[in-house]
């Protein structure tokens, strides 16, 4: 592991000339996609592509679309020419992919089978896999969290290739900078391992989630109305199960600890909202795992986790999804200016590529890792929230310690309150375009490059600047009796916090608290993990997670995004 004293020297930011050279080949778009007012380009494109099903000839009822259903070819008759109207209807989403593929097979007089298969590569977990076999040729495998979704994805993959709808990727010049920034908003491809098909009504369902978050937070602060001032930065994790949504973790905050290093693990280093919410989510996971390991059938049934036949690790039960709501865009690359364009003769090309690089948070302010103040090497710094989101979309949100017990847990949907942004372009690029799907094949078993659905929703709370509460952070997880308030400057609980852990004033989200829960869970699970002498050792013993983390860091550096900062190892050399 690299020393913390050298991280700022190892980052490489491409020169302005390289940035301009890299973006010269970018060609103007040949088509313009017009979206309705109030919808992001992706939301509109996906809903049009996958949600509308009209009554057209050859549209098969869903119960008949089993894995054994096939279109019978007629070798005597010549194939029909594919009408342009058919292609346009499919591209507009007026025919769903499965129906469209069957119609294509009928017109071309070819045999079609939609067969259930196994997941490709090293992708394991609660995913169904289908592939289309057209005239004896097998096309790419489509995955989904249910059979309907995986069939649709498989049909779309086959049709896009048969109709030659896939446009070639623009050639990337080999420079040290990140990939070119798209000149105009585009409908991003969702042909990834875990693609999310946007069905009719999904946008309305997402809009309701922000209201659910608001109602839950209002309940938590019903007796302390002054806490409403924390709401501007609020982030929350929501469990979706059988169409029902439940808020399970909440965090607020816009600051991070940047003082001297404390080796006891009892200081909370990053109190930005989404980071605080994610650490609260970990506490929720620990409680759910204790339910499972209780061996009480009734309690095990309540747990969101279950056994995985192909592994000794637990996994989320089927039809359980995790959604993230953020009242505002996370700091870092997600806040890239929507108006930036790639005109190589303007400064915006440099700005766009620079903003896509990795960022570090120092006392709530954001810097490129290479430009971070030099005195930061003697203090604790954290990667930006945008960069941490990018990391979670590859490694999962569960972290190293919980990876001893469960498979990676990925976010299904990310919802952004529309109070301070009109589109999700920056977040789409930061999460979906900085890391290529090809990285999945290089990752350990169960890890993949996740592609969450991203959408704008009505803000749960208005954005407001309140200097009095600038440094304070609030956290809560399902099962907590009360809220906890942490001072981001000191990384400790405030005197006025409804919840206090004891004389040390350590937060229930700190590293020491997580290690304590880890030891308890290891005992309940009867796993020989207690031999780890320190927090750092327990993390390092999670071999697959550490391998995936190293591959992600190498990928980001090799593609010109900069180096992931490495904190001093002494902050993790503690035990209980």
Swiss-Prot record:
SUPFAM superfamilies: dsRNA-binding domain-like. One of its GO terms (biological process) is RNA processing. GO terms for cellular component: cytoplasm; male germ cell nucleus; nucleolus. It is found in: Nucleus. Disulfide bonds: none annotated. Residues 96-164 form the DRBM domain. InterPro entries: A_deamin (IPR002466), ADAD1_DSRM (IPR044455), dsRBD_dom (IPR014720). GO terms for molecular function: double-stranded RNA adenosine deaminase activity; double-stranded RNA binding; tRNA-specific adenosine deaminase activity. Pfam families: A_deamin, dsrm. Keywords: Developmental protein, Differentiation, Nucleus, RNA-binding, Spermatogenesis. It comes from the Eukaryota. The keyword Nucleotidyltransferase does not apply. Residues 249-574 form the A to I editase domain. CDD domains: DSRM_ADAD1 (cd19905). PANTHER family: ADENOSINE DEAMINASE DOMAIN-CONTAINING PROTEIN 1, EUKARYOTE SPECIFIC DSRNA BINDING PROTEIN. Belongs to the ADAD family. Required for male fertility and normal male germ cell differentiation. Plays a role in spermatogenesis. Binds to RNA but not to DNA. This is Adenosine deaminase domain-containing protein 1.
């Amino acid at each position: 592991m690299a020393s913390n004293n050298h991280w700022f020297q190892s980052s490489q930011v491409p020169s302005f000339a390289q940035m301009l050279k890299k973006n010269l080949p970018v060609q103007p778009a040949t088509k313009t996609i017009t979206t309705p007012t109030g919808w992001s380009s992706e939301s509109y494109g996906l809903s049009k592509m996958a949600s509308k099903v009209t009554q057209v000839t050859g549209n098969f009822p869903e119960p008949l679309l089993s894995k054994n259903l096939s279109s019978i070819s007629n070798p005597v008759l010549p194939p029909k020419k594919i009408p342009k109207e058919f292609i346009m209807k499919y591209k507009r989403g007026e025919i769903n992919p499965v129906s469209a593929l069957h119609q294509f097979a009928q017109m071309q007089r070819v045999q079609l089978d939609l067969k259930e298969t196994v997941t490709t590569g090293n992708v394991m977990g609660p995913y169904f896999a289908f592939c289309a076999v057209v005239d004896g040729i097998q096309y790419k495998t489509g995955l989904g969290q249910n059979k309907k979704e995986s069939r649709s994805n498989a049909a779309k993959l086959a049709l896009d290739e048969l109709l030659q709808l896939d446009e070639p990727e623009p050639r990337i010049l080999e420079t040290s900078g990140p990939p070119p920034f798209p000149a105009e908003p585009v409908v991003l491809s969702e042909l990834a391992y875990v693609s999310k098909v946007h069905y009719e009504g999904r946008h309305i369902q997402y809009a309701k989630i922000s209201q659910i978050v608001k109602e839950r937070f209002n309940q938590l602060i019903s007796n302390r109305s002054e806490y409403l001032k924390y709401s501007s930065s609020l982030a929350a994790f929501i469990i979706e199960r059988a169409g029902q949504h439940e808020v399970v973790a909440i965090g607020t905050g816009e600051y991070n600890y940047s003082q001297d290093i404390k080796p006891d693990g009892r200081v909370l280093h990053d109190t930005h909202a989404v980071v605080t919410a994610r650490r609260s989510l970990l506490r929720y996971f620990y409680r759910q795992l204790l339910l499972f390991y209780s061996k009480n059938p009734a309690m095990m049934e309540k747990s969101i986790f279950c056994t995985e036949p192909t592994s000794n690790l637990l996994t989320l039960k089927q039809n359980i999804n995790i959604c993230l709501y953020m009242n505002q865009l996370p700091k870092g690359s997600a806040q890239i200016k929507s108006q930036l364009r790639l005109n190589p003769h303007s400064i915006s090309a440099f700005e766009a590529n620079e903003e896509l690089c990795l960022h570090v948070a120092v006392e709530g302010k954001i810097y490129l890792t290479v430009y971070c103040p030099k005195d930061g090497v003697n203090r604790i710094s954290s990667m930006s929230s945008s960069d941490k989101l990018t990391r979670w979309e590859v490694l999962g949100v569960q972290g190293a310690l919980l990876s001893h017990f469960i498979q990676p847990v990925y976010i299904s949907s990310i919802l952004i309150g529309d109070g301070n942004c009109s589109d999700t372009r920056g977040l789409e690029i930061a999460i979906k375009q900085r890391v290529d799907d090809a990285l999945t094949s290089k990752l350990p078993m169960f890890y993949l490059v996740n592609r969450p659905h991203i959408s704008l929703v009505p803000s749960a709370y208005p954005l407001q600047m309140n200097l009095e509460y600038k440094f304070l952070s609030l956290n809560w997880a399902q099962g907590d009796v009360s809220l906890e308030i942490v001072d981001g400057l000191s990384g400790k609980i405030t005197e006025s916090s409804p919840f206090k852990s004891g004389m040390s004033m350590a937060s229930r989200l700190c590293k020491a608290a997580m290690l304590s829960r880890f030891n308890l869970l290891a005992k309940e699970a009867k796993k020989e993990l207690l031999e780890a002498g320190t927090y750092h050792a327990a993390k390092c013993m999670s071999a697959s997670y550490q391998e995936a983390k190293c591959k992600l860091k190498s990928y980001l550096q090799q593609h010109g995004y900069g180096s992931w900062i490495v904190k001093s190892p002494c902050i993790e050399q503690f035990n209980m």
